[in-house]
Amino acid sequence: MNADGRTRLHQTPEWAALVKHREQLGEVRLREMFAADPGRGTGWTLRVGDLHVDYSKHLVTDETLALLQELAAATGVSGLRDAMFRGERINITEDRAVLHTALRAPRDAVIEVDGENVVPQVHAVLDKMAGFADRVRTGEWTGHTGRRIRNVVNIGIGGSDLGPAMAYEALRAFTDRSLTLRFVSNVDGADLHEAVRDLDPAETLFIIASKTFTTIETITNATSARSWLLAGLGGDEKAVAKHFVALSTNAEKVADFGIDTANMFEFWDWVGGRYSFDSAIGLSLMIAIGPDRFREMLDGFHLVDEHFRTAPAESNVPLLMGLLGVWYGSFLGAQSHAVLPYSHYLSKFTAYLQQLDMESNGKSVDREGKPVQWQTGPVVWGTPGTNGQHAYYQLIHQGTKLIPADFIGFARPVDELSEELKSQHDLLMANFFAQTQALAFGKTPDEVRAEGVPEELVPHKTFPGDHPTTTILARELTPSVLGQLVALYEHKVFVQGAIWNIDSFDQWGVELGKVLAKRVEPALTEGADVPGLDPSTGALVAAYRELRGRR
């Protein structure tokens, strides 16, 4: 029991009921469940916005879902959700509100933080972004030499990179193809080198994304980009203001860098980095797709926000997806979760979800600071189909691990493809549907034998099935649909964190390595003695210096 008198999660009757249910359920056979309920394939579906969600191929019964709903009620998921939407400080370790939902609220909404409606601030920044994006897109904004901007390079890291980079790839078919967009995040100098090596400085705009303007990787890359620009434009310091803008709140450091603070786009402490690409952090995306399509994306986010906030528990899609994740992770022993989009344009979607999910729920203490006695966030992984089918699907089909998976697909290819390329879409989606069937129902030894397979090969060609999947299907990938998908996963992650009683909105795990890196760097560059360096790391530092030719 916690100090406040609350029963800890694993000691609640609802948790105990699920443990008992898991024992009684035994081995779940999807073939048997579908045979017993012919309507399962059509009845176990939900819809939110443009997303058709099929959860029939999961290792759950009606009783499982009912018990999970009781767990959600007992752990106060809806209360914490409502507190988040109200602007309460639910990020307890940093004493901050969590209001990424305000970033896509309509102009007439009222959402208060400490008694102040933040929606007018949000729309003021969006309007400022739109004005700037239009000036770049039309050629009104020119560089130092008077030439129009044709290249945009976003420099950020974490949420300042993963979100806009993912969304740009997802919405390439909606971008202005006359503009080249690149994203730099790695402090490895090769990242910036490859991003700018074929660009003309006179036509290149850099967007520096750092709330504090002190993020070491971002400012290191920004400083190198500044040197590259000045070297290419004759060294005139005035050029910086025409080729750099900032996504930040630190006006002093932005000005010191040479950026005009009139071209600084702000965001707020109640926006976490991994939830931020629909804020000023998305400026590069807005330049690429235009303000109108950016707003369509925000409307897609808001649609799912409202669904999550108002839909009854039994038809609430993010709640359902979160509960299924808790079922597999906390009761069936699953350690990972695969997200498998059958769309080339979603090639960076799973990498984006890795930060969203693992940085949020990769925690081992609860909100009271006590070690958890239950499994929390899974390892999230995956790549677009059909590539994965020729790589790791073997392990999912016939390996020894339980790996729940989400399959995301679209009924229509993007319009700009040729008719011949559009015709390939049916083959792509045939694989999409075939894989979920194969994972669910497998292939029995008798079915293998019926094909005349030699007996010694029968075990090798048998597929056990009973691998759970969620299928998410939409008509086509549009800005609105992308917003809906991202919001769906945002709120799924929220649900799981609420049930596990962890703070899903801090990320202290990234801090220790940063601190140690600052201490280690002088040992690499100067050979300085670093107090507290363990023998293994000390030996590795010495080996590094020798390989670098430093004694």
From Swiss-Prot:
Primary location: cytoplasm
UniProt xrefs under CDD domains: SIS_PGI_1, SIS_PGI_2
Keyword vocabulary terms for this entry: Cytoplasm, Gluconeogenesis, Glycolysis, Isomerase
Pathway: Carbohydrate biosynthesis; gluconeogenesis; Carbohydrate degradation; glycolysis; D-glyceraldehyde 3-phosphate and glycerone phosphate from D-glucose: step 2/4
Gene3D superfamilies in the record: 1.10.1390.10, Glucose-6-phosphate isomerase like protein, domain 1
Subcellular compartments: Cytoplasm
Top EC group: isomerase
Location of the active site: 359 (proton donor), 390, 514
One GO CC term, this protein: cytosol
PROSITE patterns the UniProt entry points to: P_GLUCOSE_ISOMERASE_1, P_GLUCOSE_ISOMERASE_2, P_GLUCOSE_ISOMERASE_3
GO MF term (any one): carbohydrate derivative binding
Reactions listed under catalytic activity: alpha-D-glucose 6-phosphate = beta-D-fructose 6-phosphate
Keyword Cytoplasm part of the UniProt annotation: yes
Pfam (any one): PGI
GO BP term, example: glucose 6-phosphate metabolic process
Entry's EC annotation: 5.3.1.9
InterPro entries reported in the protein's UniProt record: G6P_Isomerase (IPR001672), G6P_Isomerase_C (IPR023096), Phosphoglucose_isomerase_CS (IPR018189), SIS_dom_sf (IPR046348), SIS_PGI_1 (IPR035476), SIS_PGI_2 (IPR035482)
Record function comment: Catalyzes the reversible isomerization of glucose-6-phosphate to fructose-6-phosphate.
Family: Belongs to the GPI family.
Name the UniProt record assigns to this protein: Glucose-6-phosphate isomerase 2
Gene: pgi2
